[in-house]
């Protein structure tokens, strides 16, 4: 529901009832703005509409100019355009790839390429590759993100407008993003953050609109529209990057607080009415957004239906759903008496043996069997070959297929010995069994039970299915002692083991790291080598989605290695260091990702001031001193607290993450900090003092100033000074944003603030 068109510019119509009567809040009997506690949210704007239109046009044009200035430069691949340009090409070729981020934003970029008629032939392989010699619609890609980055600014403006802040406040807050060096750099390149940021901004805006509809009257058309618009925006956030969970936590916090208010007996709602509120929010903010999120994965799987570079990240079962999958082409039925190689899925190590033996005594004093070593070896080798043999007494003949969970024996071809597991401690794990081999005479004699194994299926329902190379995963299960063969690369064997991987018997049989696959059948005859086309196998969507999620989170958590431009979250609010995006050594030009340090430190100060005000207010009120008036406190504990909590939700979780972290991860929190900072200083430059320092204006019936005066002139001077400083920084650092100007070493050094390390400083 839009703000009423009739404007009284700060004057409230006369009230005939107590505006603070809690029983009137959130009820259909009280639709008018003067009958709710947050009446200032619903009252007319404090300034004429034309003033808002003027300022939103100005800041939007500034944002547009900043992002589209020389959008074509550099005509080379910059930073992570390597990844997201490449992914767009894979979508256009329908080649399956793997990435740790959800697909929505990547598909939007690919969609732009499709509209341009691009075929995806260029793969953006390295930073610095020329777009002139490798044609790609890079300007269209960049322009798409630049448009989104530009539109983020008016969305921010209108968010504060809906919260009834003055036009200059809305303009200032949005200016902090419009000419922020980090936002401009990130939203004019082929990256995901432009889509992420505008989705977060839209979420904030839509939720504010929804909340105002809630105050007027719930369950109207406008109420439903803005509820579901909030959910749609949330779905875009979570479908772009999983940091969208932080946005969910912010909106979730606000929704829970609101529901708690509705549950209050003073709200006048029955439990049935409350449950209606709860169910509508659950549906609009959680269930429908989750379905939309799943929809993008369905599109992702539908488009990427051909084998590609992402095959190796997925299971054999998943790969069989892809056209032209090498696994499907090379997959063969494993027969008894076949000579095979067996590969561990997690480490790509082959089951291997050689004539060298385990030492009689390990370094820690434990005793081994001194048997022949069985190790994991990551390279092709004759010693990786094993013959599959049936157990004694079996009538199985040559050429008969091996079935999952049948008892089998494995003969090591090179040393003519049987694979064996026994109750002797392994080299590194005293609780796990040693794996070795024994002679044919011993294996056919008293040690025979210890040579029996089975290719155990990962699912009970697959028992009895035919074993195939490449595509069927299994556990190599030891029948006698009930362990599964396992290897790892956490620590390699010492010199006596030739720095190869330990293989042992893991008592945790169903551990997913116990999975193996037959990699090759060595002794295939010509008849079996003939390729027989196979039908692409279907796999239920949810099964594909679950497997993809597991791989995404697993590989995301593995992004923990050191990176020269990685940084810790404590350094982000002050933008102490940045990231080198691109360099041109011949012309001494560079693009360096860094925040507008003046603007970012202004936000740090604003956050600190807010915390100080809140603490002081709580303490003084506890002592019976009511310094702040009612309207100031409603704004501090209303929209400002909402923005502050949202900032916390988007910032502090990064301290818990072990993966690589970069400055651009702070951009969502920075966006919210800009909204927060603009709103805070309007409150500070208002008449905040209560009418009577000894009376609590929050008590029902207490008199208070409904429209505290804003000291416009000093406030305007303050904002102009800060804006000029922010604009100066943007201009001064613009050579690092656009990379279009060669700086002398002294000019480079003059821009190395805090921990910034630039190229060409010497």
UniProtKB/Swiss-Prot annotation:
Biological process terms in GO annotation: fungal-type cell wall biogenesis; protein O-linked glycosylation; protein O-linked mannosylation; regulation of endoplasmic reticulum unfolded protein response
Annotated CDD domains: beta-trefoil_MIR_PMT4-like
Reaction equation(s) it catalyzes: a di-trans,poly-cis-dolichyl beta-D-mannosyl phosphate + L-seryl-[protein] = 3-O-(alpha-D-mannosyl)-L-seryl-[protein] + a di-trans,poly-cis-dolichyl phosphate + H(+); a di-trans,poly-cis-dolichyl beta-D-mannosyl phosphate + L-threonyl-[protein] = 3-O-(alpha-D-mannosyl)-L-threonyl-[protein] + a di-trans,poly-cis-dolichyl phosphate + H(+)
Record: glycosylation sites: 759
SMART domains: MIR
GO molecular function, one term: identical protein binding
UniProt pathway annotation: Protein modification; protein glycosylation
Assigned keywords, A-Z: Endoplasmic reticulum, Glycoprotein, Glycosyltransferase, Membrane, Repeat, Transferase, Transmembrane, Transmembrane helix
Cysteines paired by S-S bonds: none
Entries under Pfam families matching the protein: MIR, PMT, PMT_4TMC
Subcellular location: Endoplasmic reticulum membrane
Subunit structure: Forms a functional homodimer and may form a heterodimer with PMT6. Interacts with RCR1.
Role of this protein: Protein O-mannosyltransferase involved in O-glycosylation which is essential for cell wall rigidity. Forms a homodimeric complex to transfer mannose from Dol-P-mannose to Ser or Thr residues on proteins. Specifically acts on secretory proteins with an ER-luminally oriented Ser/Thr-rich region flanked by a membrane anchor such as FUS1, AXL2, GAS1, KEX2, MID2, WSC1, WSC2, OPY2, PRM5, RAX2, or YNL176.
The protein, known as: Dolichyl-phosphate-mannose--protein mannosyltransferase 4
Organism: Saccharomyces cerevisiae (strain ATCC 204508 / S288c)
Encoding gene per record: PMT4
């Amino acid at each position: 529901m839009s703000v009423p068109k009739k404007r009284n510019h700060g004057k409230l119509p006369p009230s005939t009832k107590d505006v603070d009567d809690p029983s009137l809040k959130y009820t259909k009997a009280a639709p008018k703005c003067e009958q709710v506690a947050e009446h200032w949210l619903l009252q007319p704007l404090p300034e004429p509409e034309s003033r808002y239109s003027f300022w939103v046009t100005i800041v939007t044009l500034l944002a547009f100019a900043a992002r589209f200035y020389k959008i074509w430069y550099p005509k080379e691949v910059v930073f992570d355009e390597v990844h997201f340009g490449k992914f767009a090409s894979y979508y256009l070729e329908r080649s399956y790839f793997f990435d740790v981020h959800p697909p929505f934003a990547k598909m939007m970029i690919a969609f732009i390429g499709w509209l341009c008629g691009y075929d995806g032939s260029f793969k953006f392989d390295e930073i610095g590759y020329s777009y002139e010699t490798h044609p790609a619609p890079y300007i269209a890609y960049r322009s798409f993100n630049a448009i989104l980055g530009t539109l983020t600014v008016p969305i921010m403006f209108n968010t504060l407008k809906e919260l009834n802040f003055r036009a200059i406040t809305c303009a200032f807050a949005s200016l902090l993003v419009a000419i922020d060096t980090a936002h401009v750099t990130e939203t004019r390149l082929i990256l995901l953050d432009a889509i992420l940021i505008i989705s977060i901004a839209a979420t904030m805006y839509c939720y504010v609109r929804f909340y105002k509809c809630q105050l007027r009257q719930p369950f109207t058309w406008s109420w439903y529209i803005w509820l579901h618009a909030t959910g749609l925006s949330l779905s875009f956030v979570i479908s772009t990057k999983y940091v969208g969970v932080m946005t969910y936590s912010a909106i979730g916090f606000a929704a829970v607080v609101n529901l708690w208010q509705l549950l209050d007996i003073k709200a006048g709602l029955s439990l049935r009415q409350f449950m209606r509120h709860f169910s509508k929010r659950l549906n609009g903010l959680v269930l429908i957004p989750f379905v939309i999120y799943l929809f993008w994965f369905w599109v992702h799987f539908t488009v990427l239906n051909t084998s590609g570079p992402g095959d190796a990240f997925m299971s054999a079962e998943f790969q069989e759903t892809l056209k032209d999958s090498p696994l499907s082409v090379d997959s063969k039925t494993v027969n008894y008496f076949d000579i095979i190689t067996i590969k561990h899925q997690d480490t790509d190590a082959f089951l291997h043996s050689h004539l060298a033996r385990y030492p009689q005594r390990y370094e820690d004093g434990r005793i081994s069997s001194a048997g022949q070593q069985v190790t994991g070896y990551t390279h092709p080798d004759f010693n990786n070959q094993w013959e599959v043999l049936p157990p004694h007494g079996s009538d199985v003949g040559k050429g008969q297929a091996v079935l999952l969970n049948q008892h089998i024996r494995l003969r090591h071809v090179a040393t003519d010995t049987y694979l064996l597991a026994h109750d002797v401690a392994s080299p590194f794990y005293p609780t796990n069994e040693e794996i070795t081999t024994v002679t044919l005479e011993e294996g056919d004699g008293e040690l025979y039970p210890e040579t029996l194994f089975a290719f155990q299926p990962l699912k009970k329902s697959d028992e009895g299915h035919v074993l195939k190379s490449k595509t069927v995963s299994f556990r190599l299960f030891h029948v006698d002692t009930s362990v599964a063969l396992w290897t790892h690369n956490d620590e390699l064997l010492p010199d006596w083991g030739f720095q190869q991987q330990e293989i042992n018997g893991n008592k945790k049989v169903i551990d997913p790291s116990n999975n193996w696959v037959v990699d090759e059948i060595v002794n295939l005859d010509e008849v079996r080598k003939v390729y027989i086309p196979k039908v692409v196998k279907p796999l239920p969507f949810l099964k594909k989605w679950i497997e993809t999620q597991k791989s995404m989170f697993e590989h995301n958590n593995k992004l923990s290695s050191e990176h020269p431009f990685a940084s810790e979250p404590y350094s982000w609010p002050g933008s102490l260091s940045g990231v080198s995006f691109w360099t041109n050594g011949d012309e001494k030009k560079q693009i360096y990702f860094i925040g507008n340090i003046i603007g970012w430190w202004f936000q740090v100060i604003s956050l600190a001031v807010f915390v100080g005000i809140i603490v002081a207010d709580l303490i003084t009120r506890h002592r019976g001193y009511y310094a702040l008036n009612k309207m100031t406190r409603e704004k501090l504990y209303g929209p400002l607290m909402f923005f502050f909590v949202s900032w916390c939700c988007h910032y502090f979780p990064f301290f818990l993450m072990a993966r690589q972290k970069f400055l651009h991860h702070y951009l969502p929190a920075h966006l919210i900090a800009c909204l927060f900072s603009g709103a805070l200083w309007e409150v500070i430059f208002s008449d905040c003092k209560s009418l009577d320092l000894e009376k609590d204006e929050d008590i029902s019936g207490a008199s208070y100033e409904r429209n505290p005066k804003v000291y416009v002139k000093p406030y305007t001077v303050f904002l102009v000074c800060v804006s000029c400083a922010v604009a100066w920084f943007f201009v001064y650092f613009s050579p690092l944003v656009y990379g279009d100007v060669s700086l002398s070493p002294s000019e480079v050094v003059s821009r190395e603030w805090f921990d910034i390390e630039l190229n060409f400083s010497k």
